[in-house]
UniProtKB/Swiss-Prot annotation:
SUPFAM superfamilies: Creatinase/aminopeptidase (SSF55920), Creatinase/prolidase N-terminal domain (SSF53092). It comes from Uncinocarpus reesii (strain UAMH 1704). One of its GO terms (biological process) is proteolysis. This is Probable Xaa-Pro aminopeptidase PEPP. Belongs to the peptidase M24B family. CDD domains: Prolidase.
Amino acid sequence: MDPAVDKILAGKYPAKQHARRVAEALKAAGQDGSGVIYLEGTKTRMAEDSDEAVPFRQRRNFYYLSGCDLSDSYVTYNIDKDELVLYIPPADPDEVIWTGLPMSAEEALKVYDVDVVLPSTEVNAQLAHCCANKDSKPKRVYAIPDRVCPETTFLPFDDTNWDVLAQAIEQCRKVKDEYEIALLKRANEISAQAHLAVMKASKTAKNERELEAIFRSTCLYYDSRQQSYGPIMARGVNGATLHYQTNNMDIDDPVTGERPSLLIDAGGEYRMYASDITRAIPLSGKFSPEARQIYDIVLDMQMQCFGMIKAGVAWDDVHALAHKVAIKGLVNLGILRGSEEELFQKGVSVAFFPHGLGHYMGMDTHDVGGNPNFADPNPMFKYLRLRGTLSPNEVVTVEPGVYFCRFIIEPYLKSPELSKYIDSAVLDKYWKVGGVRIEDNLVVTQDGFQNLTTVPKDAEEVERIVQQGVPAFVLVSINDI
């Protein structure tokens, strides 16, 4: 782990700085630069027909302005006074005997970058207090619709604005500060260890679920207690399903005994910040000729896209380049036929690369602010989660892929207009590959990028790691004790 990251993360999460940025964003959106920002954290919620609570996940916008991962909490930012107040649950004697004492206000003030910490029972009183001085009271409170509990009252304010706060926070979240980038880098460092553990164990694994268990346990060992999303461990044809998550198929082919490639798309989360990394692994220790050919195309797609990444570049153009590289590679293999320009204009490559090249990343894996247009009539751009130009300190994924999904490709084969562009006889050799995707996480800079992802992706290096063949899992039986 990078000591420079440790040094940055030794400080507090910059909630006060974020609050000021959001206030500036509100002003830029036409607000008068006055008022109170109000946000609520996630409430404790019980599972249906159970006395267990639903697993807790903090609201991202609340965390952005508080850095607080406690349930049933609140935060206010008085723009006029530049005062950030955190409200946390007081001790409940009935709960203390089960879960221990909660964090005190004094402890919270040392942990969180806020000016004041108060019990959550004082929220309404403090909102009223903001308006006590009629000469200097904030006239407006900013809140997010459907994110305010019925017990909260904004009656002391002249106006409640429900329209601009969420968008202002999302605009600020697009551009990461040094602390956030350090969190994302640490999440990547941990996930790199987990990916390597899966690579090393993959040659002896018997089932996809074993590899998921290794990934999750390695993340937990390094203090990543949540996954950014459900891990994808897709052997062979399962890799053609973009978000396959069954993760329970035996590795060896039941007929031939062959061990195909594995598409692993998995990332641990660190202190609310995500990672999103994808690799393809030869489970036998060596890629099949067909899998290696597709792997080389996808890696070429990614590397050529890397050459475009910098501030001011239109993401649509980077995505289009990925398709052009894919077309060239598939033509060279004989899967596609025709001129490369005609294939691009007809969108034939969408049959093999149906998703967008990447997305913003931060507290959410598919982070906010990407401005997608899922109604775009052009199928090549319909599923792009990011539209527009890149800016410094935005964090994006670059994740090209080539897939052999019958559900997606067969309509092209049946199309009177498009079937002529695909050689089905050549294609038949590649169905078993399933899919190959290679994904890294990049910080955009003025002149290029910083790659946060360190998982090996050179094909020969990946094969060498897999060939080490360490045991996937050593289970201890009760009979061995």
